[in-house]
């Protein structure tokens, strides 16, 4: 587990969020997640659930669509990049183990290693539809101290970037941008991520894209492998 490598950050991240993005109400400063825990609405809860359900299926569907459309080079770059962004994310989890905002809001600042996963604000979506979609996902979370960076924030950045690089239809690029921003907002609205986590997730995606496109794809040996493999899967 990452918390055996480095100490868990619970209070530091919370205080940084409050300092950078705090919302003052009646003389009290709340982090955005606390504000939305107290100020939410049915339509917001519904769309939050819809957006969060998109974070993995939409990139997967996009990759399959690229393959079926015969855009094999864009597909291959997109498919090869995902392990890299995940590696960057997992490196972040081990470099800086961190609790999500719902942990600080519900349990305080002392890390308890056997804390179960928590559906947080996404539970309102389950209640609204009378289902247990997010309870089944987050109730099985084995390690809650892996909030930084937010890969939820990163994945749609990657999908949007490769949709743009692949010269996809403008409506698809606009749709991906809409879903991407919706996921960013939901991460905070639901209490699953700080704004800091989201920004770091975006940074990881952009860093990974730069490293892959301007580094690996320019390296002769890798480029030759890529060209041979892209011809093989045509």
Give, region by region, the residue ranges found by the protein language model.
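N-terminal transmembrane-helix/juxtamembrane module of multi-pass inner/ER membrane proteins
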Residues: 1-59, 233
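Membrane-interface loop-to-helix entry segments
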Residues: 43-58, 143-165, 195, 199
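Interfacial segments of alpha-helical transmembrane regions
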Residues: 60-96, 102-112, 176
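Membrane-interfacial alpha-helical segments at the cytosolic side of multi-pass membrane proteins
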Residues: 61-68, 153-170, 203-214
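Alpha-helical transmembrane segments of multipass membrane proteins
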Residues: 85-93, 183, 204-212
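Membrane-interfacial catalytic/cofactor-binding modules of polytopic membrane enzymes
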Residues: 95-166
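Interfacial helix-loop-helix junctions of multi-pass membrane proteins
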Residues: 100-104, 147, 182-208
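Membrane-proximal cytoplasmic C-terminal regulatory module of class A 7TM GPCRs
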Residues: 211-234
